């Protein structure tokens, strides 16, 4: 089959630039998007729904439908082409299949974003329960694949999204930039690997193609803040501005200067659509990033400006005042060298435990009547990932492979993050920014 987009002109959609266009011969397709109310699933649905001739029907599968405030981000025409299917992928495949059949679900293409985050033991890290994560998330995919068989749904392509933990970024120093052909990191259970094995076995048995997409920190607007790591940064900025204080930085100098990657959920959705529609991309894994490296020394001043803080503060330079997370003498993904030590002066989780800040947020909620979300109601769930994003390790995803196959999409991460914060204000998660975005140019 000829390339779906290679000979076609590029397009711009808002802040998202150099996006592919596709032949008009691609039309009347159907898609199943799982994890439809999550940050990646919802934005991939938004991408598909932008093309009514190409995608006549999108089935959104999740335990609960996206709430009305999220659906309000769609046009009436888009909402008419999406239908929710209430599915619990931890139930038996037969039960899942019966609900698919009852709805008459069809899927030329499947985009799998379902994810479960079992709560770790008190005091443990977000990914400390590695085996439980592996068991739970592998079961999600395995049950769904079994249900597709029972319901006689055989897609042309099945896309699974994993992430940068594929490269062991959470376990210590790894070879950078992260490249799709890098070998698995087997220092502890990683649910991405058994998920991949399930997918490959299913696709081999059914003679269909697969794709795996690996994003970094994901940017987008959904009302589930648990995995939206940059949401608590805006909460912090809004509260500091409300109190008339500056936006202090909690990490050390290395975290301040380290250049890291982000992955806007919309751009990753465009890349995912491109990957499944391109025949040459079948059976390939692709990294997904904005191609806009962004260190905290450039993010923090903009974050302070967007919310009207009284300036910003840099990292603590007196190392005697820093806390150190020292993993001890443990092996690293790199296979040699010292383990990674993380240094910080304070955490967002500690900051959120100050009653003054919770009180300030209540006052902000009173001021902005559309603001309904209170992240201080469950501090551990809402702020833990924010600490990782604020002063965690920097890393880089190689986009060489996607470019080699013809991908050209780009977004400025500052513009994308500002857009996400603006949309989060529309769905009751944040107050709106008070200043416009400036691209990093």
List each language-model region with its residue ranges.
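N-terminal Rossmann NAD(P)H-binding glycine-rich loop of SDR-like oxidoreductase domains
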Residues: 12-54
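NAD(P)H-binding glycine-rich loop region in Rossmannoid oxidoreductase-like domains
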Residues: 31, 67-70, 74-139, 143
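Conserved Rossmann-fold NAD(P)-dependent oxidoreductase catalytic core, especially the SDR/UDP-sugar
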Residues: 108-191, 211
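Conserved beta-loop-beta element that borders a ligand/cofactor-binding pocket
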Residues: 161-162, 197-227
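Glycine-rich "substrate-gating" loop/helix at the edge of Rossmann-like oxidoreductase active sites
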Residues: 184-188, 216-230, 252-265, 292
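Glycine/proline-rich active-site loop of Rossmann-fold NAD(P)-dependent oxidoreductases
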Residues: 206, 220-236, 275-286
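A conserved pocket-lining segment of Rossmann-fold NAD(P)-dependent short-chain dehydrogenase/reductase
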Residues: 235-266, 280, 287-289
């Amino acid at each position: 089959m000829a390339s779906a987009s290679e000979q076609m002109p590029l397009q711009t959609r808002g802040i998202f630039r150099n996006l592919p266009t596709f032949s008009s011969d691609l039309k009347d397709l159907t898609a199943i998007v799982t994890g439809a109310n999550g940050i990646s699933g919802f934005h991939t649905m938004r991408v598909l729904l932008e093309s009514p001739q190409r995608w006549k029907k999108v089935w959104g599968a999740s335990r609960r439908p996206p709430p009305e405030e999220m659906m309000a981000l769609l046009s009436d025409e888009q909402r008419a082409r999406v239908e929710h299917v209430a599915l619990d992928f931890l139930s038996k495949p037969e039960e899942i299949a019966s609900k698919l059949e009852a709805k008459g679900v069809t899927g030329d293409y499947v985009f799998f974003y379902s994810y479960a985050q079992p709560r770790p033991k008190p005091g443990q890290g977000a990914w400390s329960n590695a085996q439980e994560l592996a068991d739970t998330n592998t079961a999600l995919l395995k049950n769904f694949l079994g249900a597709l068989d029972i319901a006689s749904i055989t897609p042309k392509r099945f896309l699974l999204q994993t992430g940068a933990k594929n490269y062991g970024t959470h376990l210590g120093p790894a070879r950078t930039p992260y490249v799709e052909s890098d070998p698995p990191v087997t220092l502890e259970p990683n649910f991405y690997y058994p998920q991949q094995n399930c997918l490959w076995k299913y696709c081999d048995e059914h003679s269909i193609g697969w794709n795996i997409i690996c994003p970094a920190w994901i940017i987008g607007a959904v009302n589930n803040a648990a995995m939206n790591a940059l949401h608590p940064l805006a909460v912090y900025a809004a509260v500091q501005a409300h109190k008339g204080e500056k936006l202090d930085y909690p990490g050390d100098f290395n975290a301040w200067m380290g250049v890291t990657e982000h992955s806007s959920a919309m751009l990753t959705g465009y890349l995912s659509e491109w990957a499944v529609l391109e025949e040459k991309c079948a059976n390939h894994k692709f990294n997904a990033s904005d191609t806009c490296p962004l260190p905290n020394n450039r993010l923090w001043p903009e974050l302070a400006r967007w919310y009207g803080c009284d300036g910003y503060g840099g990292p603590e330079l007196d190392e005697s005042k820093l806390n150190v997370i020292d993993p001890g003498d443990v092996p690293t993904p790199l296979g040699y060298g010292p383990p990674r030590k993380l240094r910080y002066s304070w955490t967002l989780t500690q900051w959120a435990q100050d009653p003054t800040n919770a009180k300030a947020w209540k006052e902000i909620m009173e001021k902005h009547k559309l603001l309904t979300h209170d992240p201080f109601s469950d501090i551990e769930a809402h702020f833990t990932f924010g600490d990782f994003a604020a002063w965690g390790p920097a890393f880089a995803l190689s986009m060489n492979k996607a470019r080699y196959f013809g991908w050209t999409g780009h977004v400025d991460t500052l513009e994308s993050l500002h857009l996400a914060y603006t949309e989060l204000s529309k769905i009751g998660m944040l107050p709106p920014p008070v200043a416009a975005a400036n691209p990093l140019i």
